[in-house]
């Protein structure tokens, strides 16, 4: 089936992910559950058909863009799959952006319409006059009626009621662009990556089924949000590919809200980013199974998982975390640990169906133990960036995608993250990975999170500087900084210890949880002026 759908032919992803499940008798099964509502496969099919019919009546044609500014509720899959079914390009938008950032994404994408959660509608309505391409605002959720009363705004439910649910799916093809995902902007302005219909099933089969072993009996919960490539696969394409069920959390994940979902829905598979695993481990209520007596596997991506964190989780919760790496450009995870073969501190090995290699700045392939840029190839690679020709040519080179991440491969074939290309720096003439120092820092009992950059000392020599967030209840005394430096020397090496340590309440992160080290470098540069 995978080989077939990757051929250029008539194909719409909604057929495989929704209609096929209804056809095999799963119509009454819950596909999605949020705190207030559930959505069965039959309801998902009927309502996405209605929304797909409504979009052309609003003037949206195939390949027009529809922005989705939605919390993780049942409205997200309805809007996303309705757009896909209609051949309209869905563009999920990070719900944590500022009004200026919303304006940037909406202007850059030239979205003809937006579906927005009522609680997020105010900033969109305030900037609407600056967006000539944005013809329609569609509001969902509690408060939608109040927003619609302002004029020029549609209620999502009103659009659905006005349409029949007679079968309808646009005549798209497998190689046609189905949706865009904006990169998280860990190194600057976000870029829109274009993805095709066939890529969704490719990732579901290779990672979801091939590595995680997801089946129709699984209930999944992803703390990573649906607007994030990682979350889109975790909570939507993976479970829908087999007729599974998904628990959704609209709010930002905290240990309290996550554990509440775990207790209520008892998921079998849990996905998160390393910083959330660290916060959960620091929470007093974390226990065996993390609230779910059915939990069989946990998954991490977004940033590298420190080895000590994975080992503590396994000891406390009784379930391994499969750490891996993916990207918006590749849509999902392409390197991963796997059940029964977990090596903490590594990103695992290539997911079958993907190839990976490490190259130097001239594109020459490097051997084991050598640090270079990770490049990958596989069936889910994006079609390039929207309106970013030069960056597309640098990233998507023939069959290979350049990740911008520094890695090394050990003699056993496991890949180890060393940092972003921009984040690496030399100390005493040797390349230093900020992640290695950060992993040593968070293994200290007082430190919850850490970020490391290179900073010039008084002689103009680059040395490591650390920014740390302390665990609740820890107050540094005069010995703290020397103890931490000694701890890092013992864990990472005597030349890698941070010469300066700043304590912060939090670290700058993207909406998907990645540390923005470039912002810390900018802060230091401003101080030196």
Where are each of the predicted segments found?
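Flexible, low-complexity linker/hinge segments
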Residues: 4-11, 127, 145-177
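Structural core segment of the AMP-binding/adenylate-forming
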Residues: 57-58, 85-158, 470-472
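Conserved AMP-binding/adenylation subdomain of ANL enzymes
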Residues: 201-222, 227-268, 283
């Amino acid at each position: 089936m995978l080989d077939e759908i990757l051929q250029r032919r008539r194909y719409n992803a909604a057929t495989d992910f929704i209609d096929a499940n209804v056809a095999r008798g799963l119509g009454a099964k819950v596909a999605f559950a949020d705190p207030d509502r559930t959505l069965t496969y039959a309801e998902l099919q009927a309502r996405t058909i209605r929304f797909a019919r409504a979009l052309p009546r609003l003037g949206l044609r195939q390949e027009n863009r529809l922005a989705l500014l939605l919390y993780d509720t049942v409205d997200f899959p309805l809007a996303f799959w309705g757009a896909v079914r209609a051949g309209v390009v869905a563009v999920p938008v990070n719900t944590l952006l500022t009004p200026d950032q919303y304006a940037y994404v909406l202007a850059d994408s030239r979205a003809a319409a937006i579906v927005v959660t009522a609680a997020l509608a105010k900033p969109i309505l305030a900037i609407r006059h600056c967006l000539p391409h944005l013809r329609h605002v569609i509001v969902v959720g509690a408060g939608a009626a109040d927003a619609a009363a302002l004029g020029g705004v549609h209620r999502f439910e009103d659009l659905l009621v006005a349409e029949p649910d007679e079968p309808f799916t646009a005549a798209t093809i497998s190689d046609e662009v189905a949706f865009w995902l904006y990169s998280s902007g860990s190194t600057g302005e976000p870029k829109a990556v274009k993805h095709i219909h066939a890529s969704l099933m490719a990732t579901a089969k290779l990672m979801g089924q091939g590595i995680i072993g997801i089946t129709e009996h699984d209930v999944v919960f992803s703390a990573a949000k649906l607007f994030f490539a990682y979350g889109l696969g975790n909570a939507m394409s993976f479970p829908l590919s087999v007729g599974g069920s998904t628990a959704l959390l609209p709010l930002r994940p905290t240990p309290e809200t996550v554990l509440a979902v775990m207790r209520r829905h008892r998921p079998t598979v849990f996905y998160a980013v390393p910083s959330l695993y660290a916060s959960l481990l620091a929470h007093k209520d974390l226990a065996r199974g993390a609230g779910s007596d059915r939990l069989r596997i946990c998954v991490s991506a977004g940033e590298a998982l420190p080895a000590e964190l994975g080992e503590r989780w396994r000891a406390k919760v009784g379930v391994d975390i499969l750490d891996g790496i993916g990207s918006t450009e590749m849509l999902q995870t392409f390197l991963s640990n796997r059940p029964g073969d977990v090596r903490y501190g590594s990103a695992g090995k290539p997911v079958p169906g993907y190839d990976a290699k490490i190259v130097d700045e001239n594109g020459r392939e490097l051997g084991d133990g050598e640090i270079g840029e990770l490049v990958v190839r596989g069936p889910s690679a994006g079609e390039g960036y929207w309106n970013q020709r030069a960056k597309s040519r640098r990233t998507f080179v023939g069959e290979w995608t350049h990740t911008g991440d520094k890695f090394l491969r050990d003699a056993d074939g496991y890949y180890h993250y060393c940092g972003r290309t921009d984040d690496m720096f030399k100390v005493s003439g040797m390349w230093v990975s900020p992640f290695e120092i950060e992993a040593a820092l968070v293994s200290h009992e007082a430190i919850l999170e850490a970020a490391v950059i290179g900073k010039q000392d008084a002689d103009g020599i680059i040395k490591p500087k650390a920014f740390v967030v302390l665990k609740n209840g820890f107050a540094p005394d005069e010995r703290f900084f020397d103890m931490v430096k000694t701890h890092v020397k013992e864990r990472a090496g005597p030349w890698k210890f941070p010469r300066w340590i700043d304590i912060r309440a939090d670290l700058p992160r993207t909406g998907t949880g990645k540390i923005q080290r470039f912002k810390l470098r900018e802060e230091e540069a401003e101080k030196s002026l």
